[in-house]
């Protein structure tokens, strides 16, 4: 199997063929917004406080209900806020609010009794190659609680995005299916697997906690058939297929999910502003841009970035070099006009 699947990779493949082509085949750079950067810091703090040696810091935050009143954690948060060029006012406040919510909601998984084992940042890669199913999938689980006495595993995933899931994002959630399937295969001795999402910008422990419907063997068997088909499609994906499922041709979503034409964004030009002065969001690959990439001796892209300085830290191997390239933009939004035979300026 050529490609290794993941929830995010499959979602992009299903959502927009051109975005998949740009991100995973051409390996173009992607914009990292402030929301994602803040989410990285929140996850880092949760991982740190999940360790037994940092229990006193966890207790300090719970006591004062403020992560910034625990000096070691406050220093760590501020260090990453500064390094990621986030603001020490609104962004810092937002990060601490999400941290407080995550810590105060059953952080050590005692809702089903004391766990036999707690695992933070569990990564996995599952490969199945038999008569019925052929797929390779990987993932990264924020928190895993194992309850041996009641034969239960609880998967918890922290979400730092503003909007909760709706429509197919709930009924056909790829992360839910993939994580549940993986844990069933990694821990076959456990009977039940539960999955929950914690939306840290919402009201927790109320609507901000989204518990997914349990998946039975029939559900997971059907999903493995789907994974097998996706694997075939991803392994043969080429430039011709990049135009086969453009988000711009899918219309607006009717189930409230962030999909279809919404994925393109409403900006008509790069860096366009709203009436209030804030930038309009749009897909990274909607408009043309220049970028830099590291290519090997066979001209294969190893890494790319918008700024050349962001590649300077890489250790280049023999035959590697950094080159500047130009991306022409999404074909749905950047149609090349035929040249004007009477345009003398083009000569």
Language model features with spans:
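RecB-family 4Fe-4S metal-dependent nuclease core
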Residues: 1-347
